[in-house]
């Protein structure tokens, strides 16, 4: 699986066991992702942070 880094022009290949890509936003500003990468389990959203997870190459 390949996931985009913070700047979508760059991406990385995920290590074994991390088979989801994620994108993290601040709830107050959903237009600009704060973090992107590989993850094993999609975190729950909180009052401050929203996560979007997916499982295809460069889907984040």
Curated annotation (Swiss-Prot):
CDD domains: TFP_snake_toxin. Gene3D superfamilies: CD59. Its main location: secreted. Expressed by the venom gland. GO terms for biological process: killing of cells of another organism. Disulfide bonds join 3-21, 14-38, 42-53, 54-59. GO terms for cellular component: extracellular region; membrane; other organism cell membrane. The keyword Disulfide bond applies. Pfam families: Toxin_cobra-type (PF21947). It is found in: Secreted; Target cell membrane. GO terms for molecular function: toxin activity. The keyword Amino-acid biosynthesis does not apply. Keywords: Cardiotoxin, Cytolysis, Disulfide bond, Membrane, Secreted, Target cell membrane, Target membrane, Toxin. Shows cytolytic activity on many different cells by forming pore in lipid membranes. In vivo, increases heart rate or kills the animal by cardiac arrest. In addition, it binds to heparin with high affinity, interacts with Kv channel-interacting protein 1 (KCNIP1) in a calcium-independent manner, and binds to integrin alpha-V/beta-3 (ITGAV/ITGB3) with moderate affinity. Has hemolytic activity towards human erythrocytes (EC(50)=0.074 uM) and cytolytic activity towards various cell lines. Belongs to the three-finger toxin family. Short-chain subfamily. Type IA cytotoxin sub-subfamily. Monomer in solution; Homodimer and oligomer in the presence of negatively charged lipids forming a pore with a size ranging between 20 and 30 Angstroms. This is Cytotoxin 8. It comes from Naja naja. The lineage of its organism: Eukaryota, Metazoa, Chordata, Craniata, Vertebrata.
